[in-house]
Amino acid sequence: MNNQPVVSIIIPFLNPGHWLTEAIESVLAQTYTSFEIILIDDGSVEEDAAIALKYCRRFPGKVFYYMHESHVNKGLTASRNLGLAKARGALIAFLDADDCWMPAKLTEQLGLFETMPEVQMICEASLFWYSWNDPEKENNIVQIGVPSGVYTPPQLIKLLYPFGEGQPPCPTGIIIKREVIDRCGGFEESFSGIYQLYEDQAFLFKIYSTEIIYISNQANNLYRKREDSMSSSANNLEVYNTVRKFYANWVEGYLAKIPDHNPIIDTLLTAFKKSLVYAETQPGITL
């Protein structure tokens, strides 16, 4: 690209151990080099903070380390928001500390922005990474649940989980223009504790509501699958349904603050709330 915008890559971490090294190294290996890495320490042990600080010393002006006041644990949403507050780039990307990128990830996504300037966010498929723990287990690419292409608001609310049936994007596969976050706001910090399960869905809802988005079938990110991850808690039916109710209430409150929102979204919310009521009457059912 002739004019290379800076990409701010936000990596929150809480005791990831050597995975943090793998995540950072995967960014440093990118073929697109106009980026900054923002490491947000969410109350990690000293050894993991030392990993982050080591990279800051090795790459001054390229890698940055921040922590919450008094080094407290504030959760993923607050950590991502701290990263957003420190970011200087025109583009924002997210990488969880236990995931990795393939070398062409940024190059391919920046190329898409260049050819489609109207697009405000790009979401790509993810490689679900099982072989990190079991070399005999096959990895598989999980596509986002709609065909590759450009989507206008609020199409993706209807088509993708949790209001629709399609597989949602992983945050690790997303890149977004900073100006969009300035318009729509960052991550919702009320989605903490068990509700963190839907923190990315709340963020995406705001973007889906108002912005033009490109869905890519490329997969340049490795989403590490492990049993103790936050997404695994969705297997707990009671927790899962509690979180979904919380999300529905949040959506209702959010829409109330935007009187000129698309009325199609109200129809989708009503159907979603009805599905929650139905799930309560059918033991073992999740919708």
Regions of interest found by a model, annotated:
Residues 104-143:
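Conserved donor NDP-sugar-binding/catalytic core segment of glycosyltransferases
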Residues 92:
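Short aromatic/hydrophobic "clamp" motif used to bind/position activated sugar donors
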Residues 1-28:
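N-proximal low-complexity "stem/linker" segments adjacent to membrane-targeting elements
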Residues 85, 143-239, 243:
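Conserved nucleotide-sugar donor-binding catalytic segment
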